[in-house]
Amino acid sequence: MPAKQRTAKVNRNPDLIRGVGKYSRSQMYHKRGLWAIKAKNGGVFPRHDAKSKVDAPVEKPPKFYPAEDVKKPLPNRRTAKPAKLRASITPGTVLIILAGRFKGKRVVFLKQLASGLLLVTGPFKINGVPLRRVNQAYVIGTSTKVDISGVTLDKFDDKYFGKVAEKKKKKTEGEFFEAEKEEKKEIPQGKKDDQKAVDAALIKAIEAVPELKTYLGARFSLKQGMKPHELVF
């Protein structure tokens, strides 16, 4: 492809001598067609307003940038959505706990808390399971029901089960080397009274159904030859 030839720009008003043009200002006015532009715009030359200056930033950007790219933290747009309760779990349903300290125990479901966890109890007097929160992923709902209409559950929420943060005390040199047994944490008397009140109302309803007390006291386990997917709970 041949290279384009550059054409020299021709001055429309060549200099006769340095600083003196061939044509006067009035001649160039007509030669350049400025009169036509002025007539087209109502006898006034078109005016272009100057662009507004961009406001200078309050803080100057840094002169130097870090050698390694610093990752910018992404905004957290996650929102807490209430967990949907399984259709097989309704207030009063007897559940089987599958994991944790009380695995295999049968408990009575009382209500779902705002966090999505299930509020359950043994009752404590029958199988030793106190009022506690359980994730519904670790329970099996059975077809057995208990009437819990006489149980008052207004005071039980997620804050009720929250632990009070205790300040750790610095041990002295003597206490550090002494092998002392840790003191057992005592349960507040108020929580003990709440457990007794719930147990009393539940046991009254449980004793009205024959064999239900024995059923709740027995631990669930699989024996040889039993197929979990074929069991009807």
From Swiss-Prot:
Biased composition range(s): Basic and acidic residues: 48-72
A GO cellular-component term linked to this record: mitochondrion
CDD domains recorded: KOW_RPL6
Molecular function as annotated in GO: mRNA binding; structural constituent of ribosome
Entry superkingdom: Eukaryota
Residue numbers spanned by region Disordered: 48-82
Signal peptide region: none
Keyword line: Ribonucleoprotein, Ribosomal protein
Family classification: Belongs to the eukaryotic ribosomal protein eL6 family.
Name of this chain's protein: Large ribosomal subunit protein eL6y
Organism expressing this protein natively: Arabidopsis thaliana
